[in-house]
A protein has these predicted regions:
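N-terminal membrane-anchoring/stem segments of glycan-assembly enzymes
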Residues: 1-80, 424-426, 458-476, 486, ...
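Loop-to-transmembrane boundary segments
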Residues: 2-14, 89-93, 97-102, 358-381, ...
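Membrane-embedded multi-pass helical conduit in multi-pass membrane proteins
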Residues: 21-49, 369-476
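Internal catalytic domains of large membrane-associated glycosyltransferases
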Residues: 66-343
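Hydrophobic alpha-helical transmembrane segments and immediately flanking/interface helices
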Residues: 109-121, 401-404, 475-498
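Long, K/E/R/D-enriched contiguous segments that form extended
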Residues: 309, 322-401, 428
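Low-complexity, intrinsically disordered or signal/transmembrane-proximal segments
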Residues: 519-526, 542
């Protein structure tokens, strides 16, 4: 009972603090105007510091991303002991995604430059999806012979579980244990698990780089590995303001990988089978399964574990829908689900207390960084915009005083110094994002750059408000139901183009897998409408090679 009360208190405290912060420009201007002014000055300095860290992280991340794509990870791995025994297990949980969405992801797995005899795939469906058996059968027919093992699982809902990715992953992992490991078909000692979303396109060097990182690091089989998630796969299908917003999300994902000591996994990540088994698989009653699993492994193994970045891109779809309204709704609900990570604050805080094998300063800072992120997410917009607008309306006498005007001028000057950081980030985005399928003229470039000026509006509607929604639900004791982000079918993504991108001749499978990833049209390996034919051709070549 005491633990339950502590858990609930740790849910209420940060969420109530957020509401206290965002309403501070109103009540603070009336009760403690001078203290509010100095508080806003301090927050402005904090935001300038975060802007500098963000911009420098984007630059360093961009440089490391470029270098990592040039390295021959396989050649470097050959000299490491145990390389030939290493086996990759890729679990792809899916619910409701179309066959072509999942096939697109599997195509990119087939392009990996590691030997596919050392890659096994698990397609983890939900039993409640009525179309899952038919899609599973077709996907198995198209891809099963490409990999060492190709396992199909159907997660059955059970009492006490939360419908979502975590419970599906645990079900799939238990089926792997029963069907592949207990039967001796896979060796668990040298098995590396990668969790891959249904719309994630792995860079063709990712599994090779993952193997190198596992084998070259002390305690590599205990570490967790995080690639760079970039929401560029459907970049040009979105309207300009949403392109700007998702560019910021992509670059934030890249920048946060630079200070790896505070890195937490998200979406697509990798860890050893040993780590998965020793912590008892994924907890089936949580929604933010990625960060939760990260802390679960960290607290279990202690100082031996590190979360290590792999600076290779994983191209994912930004939230999209068949109409503009559906796109906005899907974007809102996706951010709401991400922000629901605030519900894990009690787990992180209480877990840090029990994790005696971690140094005390590491435990404290891990909690502080996690809480800081979730406090600033819903509140920063209100402080940056309304913090300077509301106090003069509520308390004009103080606003026109000498101290009030000095504080206002100082805040404006500090925030003005953040603009060069934003310009630098926009420039890196311009260099990093995919080229327009029809080419960009000067008008398109200007529209793209000008769309960043709408970030204050888009940031309120599709960043601050969904995060505040998550906090409010948790504060009121209302739980969130897992909602899968809608994916637009592969063919629909190209409906605005005059013709599908030309496809290169296949040749043999090995040269196909070694093709430069950044030369593939729109970061997709195959043209829409031809994926079945391509898979069949690759399948025939691969069968001949075997």
């Amino acid at each position: 009972m005491r633990l339950i009360r502590a858990h609930r208190a740790l849910e209420v405290l940060p969420t109530a603090t957020v509401w206290l912060i965002i309403t501070a420009p109103v009540w603070g201007a009336l009760v403690i105007p001078a203290a509010l002014g100095f508080g806003l000055v301090i927050f402005s300095l904090y935001w300038l510091w975060k802007s500098l860290v963000f911009a420098s992280g984007v630059l360093i991340g961009f440089w490391r991303l470029h270098n990592a794509q040039q390295r021959d990870w396989i050649a470097e791995s050959l000299a490491l002991p145990g390389y030939e025994k290493l086996h990759h297990l890729v679990i792809v949980p899916t619910f409701g995604e179309s066959e072509e969405i999942v096939a697109d992801t599997l195509h990119y797995l087939a392009l990996q430059d590691v030997a596919l005899e050392r890659v096994s795939v698990v397609l983890a469906f939900e039993e409640r999806d009525p179309s899952a058996p038919a899609r599973a059968q077709r996907l198995s027919a198209r891809f099963a012979a490409l990999f060492q093992h190709f396992l199909i699982t159907f997660h059955q809902d059970r009492e006490g579980e939360v419908r979502g990715k975590a419970s599906n992953l645990t079900w799939a992992a238990r089926r792997v244990q029963a069907e592949l490991i207990d039967t001796g078909r896979l060796d668990p000692i040298d098995l590396i698990v990668s969790v891959c979303d249904a719309d994630s396109r792995l860079h063709h060097r990712y599994l090779g780089a993952l193997g190198y990182e596992v084998l070259s690091q002390p305690n590599g089989f205990l570490h967790i590995f995080q690639p760079a998630i970039l929401f560029y796969a459907n970049h040009w299908r979105l309207i300009a303001p949403l392109r700007a917003l998702n560019s910021i999300y992509s670059l934030w994902e890249l920048a946060r990988m630079v200070p790896s000591h505070r890195l937490v996994t998200q979406s697509t990540y990798s860890l050893s089978w040993r780590a998965v088994c020793e912590v008892g698989f994924w907890d089936v009653d949580v929604i933010p399964e990625d960060s939760h699993m990260c802390f679960k492994v960290l607290f279990h193994f202690g100082r031996r574990v590190k979360v290590r970045p792999i600076f290779l891109p994983v191209y994912a779809d930004a939230a999209e829908g068949a109409t503009l309204r559906r796109t906005l709704e899907n974007q809102y609900h996706q951010i709401l689900r991400w922000a629901w990570g605030v519900s894990d604050i009690p787990y992180v805080a209480l877990g840090a207390v029990r994790a005696r094998d971690l140094p005390w300063h590491v435990r404290i800072m891990r909690v502080v960084w996690y809480v800081e992120e979730h406090l600033m997410w819903p509140s920063h917009w209100f402080l940056l915009t309304l913090g300077g607008l509301i106090p003069p309306l509520v308390n004009p006498a103080y606003a026109h005083s000498t101290l009030g005007m000095w504080q206002s001028s100082l805040i404006s000057a500090i925030l003005g110094l953040c603009l060069p950081c934003l310009l630098l980030v926009i420039l890196v985005d311009w260099r990093l994002r995919p080229q327009h399928p029809d080419g960009e003229d000067s008008i398109d470039v200007l529209i793209g750059w000008a769309s960043f000026a709408l970030l204050p509006i888009v940031g309120l509607l599709l960043c601050a408000l969904p995060a505040l929604d998550a906090h409010t639900r948790l504060l009121l004791g209302r739980r969130l139901e897992y909602r899968v982000t809608e994916k637009v079918p592969v063919q629909a993504r190209f409906r605005d183009q005059q013709a599908a991108p030309a496809m290169k001749p296949l040749g043999k499978l090995a040269p196909l897998r070694r093709a430069r990833f950044d030369q593939l049209p729109q970061y997709r390996a195959y043209a829409p409408g031809s994926t079945t034919a391509v898979t069949d051709a690759v399948l025939l070549v691969y069968r001949d090679l075997r």
